[in-house]
């Protein structure tokens, strides 16, 4: 039980740190970049620009009516995040599975806070070479993508060496 509580504390610190980093960088981006000027670095490989994203990932759903967007990106997303948090505490996940869930949860929660507080999500980073560029994103999006990669790695590894204890229901907190 003591080991389990240590893991929970470490995960809480990781989630709070990820959210904190995202919140701080979004605040700085708002203060420095909101004027509309694009800052380019490393031969235009890295661009910093302020964007208020009303949609989801890469702006998907931005053209939906306001009521649909609010329901989809705030209410439903909030429920999904809550379920993820409960499941993360309930199951004895380990390794890449636990890492992935926590990163997705942290990034999703930070973007959800933006959406609830502002109605939009602040994005400010863009990477690329020449005409090949990413969409504009933020630290929370990076956490989500790293989390998805960790979940994929966990799924790949579990098909090769299944460990039933990775998903045993845990004891109540």
Cite the ranges covered by each PLM segment:
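Alpha-helical transmembrane bundles and membrane-interface segments of multipass inner-membrane proteins
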Residues: 1-173
């Amino acid at each position: 039980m003591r080991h389990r509580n240590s893991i929970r504390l470490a995960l809480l610190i990781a989630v709070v740190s990820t959210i904190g980093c995202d919140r701080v960088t979004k605040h700085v981006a708002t203060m420095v970049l909101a004027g509309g000027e694009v800052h380019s670095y490393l031969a235009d490989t890295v661009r910093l620009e302020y964007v208020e994203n009303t949609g989801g990932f890469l702006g998907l759903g931005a053209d939906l009516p306001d009521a649909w967007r609010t329901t989809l990106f705030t209410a439903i997303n909030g429920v999904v995040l809550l379920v993820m948090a409960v499941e993360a505490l309930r199951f004895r996940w380990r390794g890449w599975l636990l890492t992935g869930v926590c990163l997705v949860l942290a990034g999703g929660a930070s973007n959800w806070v933006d959406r609830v507080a502002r109605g939009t999500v602040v994005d400010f980073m863009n990477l690329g070479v020449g005409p090949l560029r990413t969409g504009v994103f933020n630290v929370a999006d990076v956490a989500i993508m790293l989390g998805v990669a960790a979940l994929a790695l966990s799924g790949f590894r579990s098909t090769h060496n299944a460990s039933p204890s990775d998903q045993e229901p845990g004891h109540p907190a």
